Amino acid sequence: GANTAFADRQADDRQGGWTDQGGNDLSVMKPGTLKVSGIPFAILNDAETGGKSCVVLGGPQRSYLTQTANVPVDNVQGAYLYLLHGAAWCPPAKEQKMTGVLFVDYADGSTSEFHVRCGRDVADWAKPDAYKNAVRVWTAYNNNTQVSLFASKFKLKGPAVKAVRLEARDSAWMVAAMTLGDDTRISGIKKQVTLDKTYTAPALAAPLPAVQVQSVPKNIIL
C-alpha cells in the first residue's frame, strides 16, 4: 500500500517524504475526498497514517527510494482504474519515456499490464502541461513552486480487482490516490495567464490622422 508521506521534513536525507526534496513536497494537499469530474479520490492524512499516505517510487534519480509498490484491493469491480498522480525528473515529454509499469491483478488470476509514459499517461508535477491520458485536475503553490497532479484512466478487463502493482522505470512516480469506477470523461483545469504588472499607454504627441472613408467599396482582385 502507501509507502511514504506527502510532507518531507528534510531534503536529501534518504528517508523520503514525497520526493525527498524538503519543502518542495505535497504537504499542501488537503486530506479528505477530492472529487474530479465526479470521481472520488481519498486523500489520506499524514497525521493519521503514520506517514504512509501515498505511493512514491524513486526511479533512477531517487534510486534509494522504493522502486515497486503493491496496493491490495478487496476484490472490487470497476470498468476503469483512475490514478491521481504525477512524475518528477521526467525526460522530454516528446520522447514519451516510460515512467513506470502498472499491473492490475484480478481475482480470477489474470493480469492487465499498462505502460505509463510521461507525455501521454502522466506528466511532470512541476509543469502545467497536460496530455492525452494525463488531465491536469489539481494545482497549488507549495511555497516552492506551482505543482500539479494529473488524472489518468486505464480500461480494465471486468473481473474483480485483487491488487494494483506499480514499478518505476525512467522517472520518479508519485501516486496521491487511486480509485475504481465507471467510464467518466475527465475535465481538466485551464491554464491561467496572469500579468505581473499593469502598464499605462504613453500619451500621443499629436492625434492620429483620420482615415478617409470612401463611399463606394472597391473590389479586391485576387
Task: For the regions a language model picked out, list residue spans one by one.
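N-terminal/edge-of-domain interface segments
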Residues: 1-222
